[in-house]
């Protein structure tokens, strides 16, 4: 598996460090096999991440042992922040726990300046969501890369919190 990935990358002259291999939380059913595969991928230079953490069948009791670089919190965490202060408290505690375990934390589903501010004050490393850019086709993304003065996103120009995609 890892060797096969490396053969393909070598054929096309792609550095494994340029790619991120994502593990979905629901994939953890085969945890032991995945743990070995992720370790092998990391040793080969791949960046590894857990996507949509907290969405599926949680494996919070195993996360400290999984060889990952990043954990991506699913959009449900942001939706809870909009409901009440308990959602914000839960999000902050989750981010703190993941950071204490040595992970970079990315929050998905960010859709407002308020959410960006909450994440900035919570220690979140990276954010993504419709607040920064709606999903783009490859052609639209390519056009955006060459816009002068732009930072790879269509930020809301008239808003105070139009950062470039990171908290």
Predicted regions and their residues:
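Generic alpha-helical secondary structure signal
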Residues: 1, 9, 35, 135-136, ...
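Bacterial c-di-GMP phosphodiesterase EAL domain
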Residues: 1-13, 26, 40, 55, ...
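Charged helix-capping and loop-helix junction motifs
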Residues: 3-7, 35-36, 85-92
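Hydrophobic positions in alpha-helices of CheY-like receiver
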Residues: 9, 41, 94-98
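EAL-family c-di-GMP phosphodiesterase catalytic domain
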Residues: 18-31, 46-167
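Extended low-complexity acidic/polar segments
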Residues: 36, 41-46
């Amino acid at each position: 598996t890892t060797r096969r990935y490396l053969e393909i990358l070598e054929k096309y002259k792609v550095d494994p460090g340029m790619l991120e291999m994502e593990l979905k939380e629901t994939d953890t059913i085969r945890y032991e096999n995945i743990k070995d595969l992720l370790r092998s991928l990391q040793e080969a230079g791949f960046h590894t991440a857990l996507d949509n953490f907290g969405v599926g069948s949680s494996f919070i009791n195993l996360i400290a042992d999984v060889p990952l670089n990043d954990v991506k919190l699913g959009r449900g965490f942001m939706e809870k922040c909009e409901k009440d202060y308990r959602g914000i408290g839960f999000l902050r505690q989750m981010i703190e726990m993941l950071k204490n375990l040595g992970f970079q934390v990315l929050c998905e589903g960010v859709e407002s300046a308020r959410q960006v501010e909450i994440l900035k004050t919570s220690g979140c490393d990276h954010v993504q969501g419709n607040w920064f850019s709606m999903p783009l086709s490859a052609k639209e993304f390519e056009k955006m890369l060459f816009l002068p003065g732009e930072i790879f996103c269509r930020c809301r120009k008239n808003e105070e919190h139009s950062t470039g995609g990171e908290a």
